[in-house]
Amino acid sequence: KEIYEIFSKEDASSQADRCIQCGDPFCHSKCPLHNYIPFWLKATSAMKRELAFNLSNETNPYPEITGRICPQDRLCEGDCTLNDGHGAITIGAIETFISEEGFKKGLKPTFPGITTKKKVAVIGAGPAGLACATYLLRAGIAVSMYDKQNKAGGLLTYGIPGFKLDKDVVARRVRWLQEAGMDLHVNTHVGKDVS
């Protein structure tokens, strides 16, 4: 069980409401994914949770995971303008809240379906492989993913302890990728079992 509690609606809204919508948002520029942080903070503050969910999934292949494990104190939260004397907005906790609230309401990231004749094999079902599969599926490209382990997730599944990242969170994201058209082949060592 994870040791951090998910924000309540009130806590998420009041934290998001602290965002001053900077003209040049340092949180956005410091984020390696260049997430639309001010936009989904504004949507959360206005209680537009479906919009916040869609915005957070637009630039991030798995916001429910990065909200939990990304080192926000050195990235987005570390560069938050409010960090100078007022305390940064708890961006990671809000990101997790947005995802989990969306999932409770039945929201899922949208994929167009396989719309091209292109096929790509992704070797390794760790964070980079899952992100790659996400972007390929968003482009309508069929994905076959191979991993020698018996579960997808790589470091997310085998390296990060469950008290920090519940493994069901990773499994849920993998299921969605499979529903979107990804074929997953675990227990398959590329170069040995297949070539």
Predicted regions and their residues:
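Short, intrinsically disordered, charge-balanced linker/junction segments flanking boundaries
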Residues: D193-S195
